[in-house]
Design a protein with these regions (language model features):
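Active-site-facing substrate-recognition patch
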Residues: 1-62
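Short helix-loop-beta connector
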Residues: 61-65, 110-112
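PRPP-dependent phosphoribosyltransferase catalytic core
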Residues: 2-14, 133-179
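Short glycine-rich phosphate-binding loop at a beta-alpha junction
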Residues: 63-73, 146-147
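Short secondary-structure boundary/capping segments
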Residues: 17, 24-25, 106-108, 158
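Alpha-helical structural signal in soluble globular domains
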Residues: 59, 80-85, 134, 158-162
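Short, glycine/charge-rich flexible loops or terminal/linker lids adjacent to PRPP-binding catalytic cores
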Residues: 77-116, 124-130
């Protein structure tokens, strides 16, 4: 749970109603889940996207130089957060492109800058872990990830092993409680 509640008391209910799907879903981690939060449903809705981004702005560390949107789901959210804060965005690919600039991180140079990662859903943190490693190798200071939904087990930080603090807009428990 984060300490900015209730910035938008109906957000959990609205996100849950829009995005919760039931069935059998294989997650990036290989885990199988009976429920899935289709984050693209809220990311494609400009009103819901803006509401999520406004909460994220409150969760950003004050010393953030760049907001780093992870491909693909973190990019629309990071763009909105960038627009609301005036902080530049950097877009982090899953894999460096093999042509042109051959960059993994598109946008301003990250070297020596504090990058706060923006992600849609964190469960085990695999994509965030990969992006953190790549950005740190490029000279960025990465200490915080702000996510729309934290699906990790309550009370656990799946990214503690890489020294990242996870700051969620909503947790799975908050979404479950909204039903």
């Amino acid at each position: 749970m984060n300490d900015v509640h209730p910035p938008d008391p109906d957000l959990a209910l609205d996100i849950d109603g829009c995005c919760r799907l039931t069935g059998e879903f294989t997650l990036r981690s290989g885990q199988v889940a009976s429920e899935y939060f289709d984050k693209y449903l809220f990311e494609a809705d400009p009103t819901l996207l803006a509401r999520v981004a406004r909460v994220m702005v409150q969760l950003l560390p004050e010393d953030t130089d760049l907001v780093g949107g992870l491909e693909l789901g973190g990019i629309p959210i990071a763009t909105m957060v960038s627009s609301l804060t005036g902080r530049p965005a950097v877009f982090v690919r899953k894999k460096a492109k093999e042509y042109g600039t051959c960059k993994l991180a598109e946008g301003p140079d990250v070297s020596g800058r504090r990058v706060t990662l923006i992600e849609d859903v964190v469960t085990t943190g695999g994509a965030v872990r990969d992006a953190t490693k790549a950005l740190r190798e490029a000279g960025a200071v990465v200490e915080v990830v702000v996510c729309a939904i934290d699906r990790s087990p309550e009370g656990e930080n799946p990214l503690a092993d890489v020294g990242l603090e996870v700051r969620p807009v909503l947790t799975k428990a908050e979404l479950d409680g909204a039903r």
